[in-house]
């Protein structure tokens, strides 16, 4: 996975519309330049979400990003950072959602891998063992990843709260501390 030479990216103050895929993709490409990937976003208060009805629910807008994003090419293979087993998986196919999603169970926590190619879910089964270093998924393009420029949303989750195949990736500002405690920084899992 191309994170060793990646550039840092903050979307905290980015002036892009998440509903305008073409403009958002140009912004990401310009930020990336010749780097293999862009990495960042954990704990950011992203005003780009406040501009979108996708993240406002029925009350306070959700703007606190709970995972780390790795912006790179569709089709990029993903390898498990640690031994795991498949907890759950599904296609979350609403616009702005995760698209292909896999949740892995590790020793004492889970990881959510979002914006995946749908083929990543082919042949998976709950309880399936995934060895550290094993390729288990691929990044999806906009047609299958929720309508985003290609990227991985990686989120560590200490308690799934009963969820299967999905979990909030963005939280309201007023609940920032609670959600970040539940979803610690996953950057150490990037390999």
Question: Residue ranges of each PLM-predicted region?
Answer:
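Acidic, glycine-rich catalytic/binding loops that coordinate metals and/or anionic ligands
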Residues: 2, 122-134, 138-144, 148-191
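Gly/Ser-enriched beta-turn/beta-hairpin loop segments
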Residues: 46-66, 92-109, 145
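Short, conserved secondary-structure segments in the cores of folded domains
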Residues: 74-77, 120, 126
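Polar/charged, compositionally biased leader and regulatory segments
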Residues: 1-69, 172-191
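Short, glycine/small-residue-enriched coil/turn segments at secondary-structure junctions
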Residues: 32-34, 58-94
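Zn2+-dependent peptidoglycan hydrolase active-site motif and core
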Residues: 80-120
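Histidine-centered active-site/metal-ligand motif
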Residues: 65, 106, 115, 151-153
